Regions:
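N-terminal beta1-alpha1-beta2 submodule of the flavodoxin-like/Rossmannoid cofactor-binding fold
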Residues: 1-64
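FMN-binding flavodoxin-like domain, especially the glycine-rich phosphate-binding loop
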Residues: 50-127
Length: 127
């Protein structure tokens, strides 16, 4: 692998990407930066945040780069939901997938995502 590329919404995916970059000595780029700086076909580790099982930014990253592994950061416990995430994103069975638990900071969510979380929270606390 040549680089770590990430998409983050509330910062958890960016934090995991930075941690991985520190441990591997690989450069780290947001997906927007990577599109400008890395050549097509570069082998990358992709770190993206999860929304309803979809790894945000994965499709774009996979079209441009050679994704060697995926880290999906979401609300569930680390190591869970892997089959669901793999199926939802149509990840090949041979592609390593790691699910990681992130932080949910409602104040960092934008627009529709914040509204969806508010609705979910009301439903959960109602019971």
């Amino acid at each position: 692998m040549k680089a770590i590329v990430y998409t983050s919404n509330t910062g958890s995916a960016a934090q995991y990407a930075a941690l991985l970059a520190k441990e591997t000595a690989l450069p780290v780029y947001s997906l927007a930066e990577a599109v400008k700086k890395l050549p097509r076909g570069t082998e990358i580790l992709y770190v993206g945040w999860l929304m309803a099982g979809t790894v945000k930014g994965y499709k774009k990253a996979a079209k441009r780069f050679a994704v060697q592994a995926v880290c999906a950061v979401g609300m569930f416990e680390t190591g869970t939901q892997t089959e669901y995430v793999r199926k939802t994103n149509k990840l090949p069975p041979e592609l390593p997938l790691f699910t990681l638990q992130g932080n949910l900071d409602r104040n960092k969510l934008h627009g529709l995502y914040r509204l969806m979380i508010d609705i979910m929270r009301k439903g959960v606390t109602k019971g």
